[in-house]
């Protein structure tokens, strides 16, 4: 089982699909990496030689941010928006959608489950 960027790639899948198990690599990036290294995308990941795995590792390490490094960058970008106090930052702070969606009836995923209304005592 090949281990790239701290992720164990599944054995029985094509290399193109197996690389998408790494956070930050989708189908397009996977195809770009394999084209750069010169590996057939339909090759099964357990058929990769150690040299091919090392080539893939080098390309990923040099060209792309993946896994923890990418997660850190994304969270820092969101934190920066919140510190700036811009509209998007305020929406993140309030846990509301920040891309213009309606919130009157929808946005339950972002807002969380409904809270029961508190009745006033008479």
From Swiss-Prot:
Gene3D superfamilies: 1.10.8.50, 30s ribosomal protein s13, domain 2. Residues 108-122 have a biased composition (Basic residues). GO terms for molecular function: rRNA binding; structural constituent of ribosome; tRNA binding. GO terms for biological process: translation. Belongs to the universal ribosomal protein uS13 family. The lineage of its organism: Bacteria, Pseudomonadati, Thermodesulfobacteriota, Desulfobacteria, Desulfobacterales. InterPro entries: Rbsml_uS13_C, Ribosomal_uS13, Ribosomal_uS13-like_H2TH, Ribosomal_uS13_bac-type, Ribosomal_uS13_CS. Residues 95-122 are annotated as: Disordered. The keyword Calcium does not apply. Located at the top of the head of the 30S subunit, it contacts several helices of the 16S rRNA. In the 70S ribosome it contacts the 23S rRNA (bridge B1a) and protein L5 of the 50S subunit (bridge B1b), connecting the 2 subunits; these bridges are implicated in subunit movement. Contacts the tRNAs in the A and P-sites. GO terms for cellular component: cytosol; small ribosomal subunit. It comes from the Bacteria. The keyword Cytoplasm does not apply. Part of the 30S ribosomal subunit. Forms a loose heterodimer with protein S19. Forms two bridges to the 50S subunit in the 70S ribosome. This is Small ribosomal subunit protein uS13. Keywords: Ribonucleoprotein, Ribosomal protein, RNA-binding, rRNA-binding, tRNA-binding. SUPFAM superfamilies: S13-like H2TH domain.
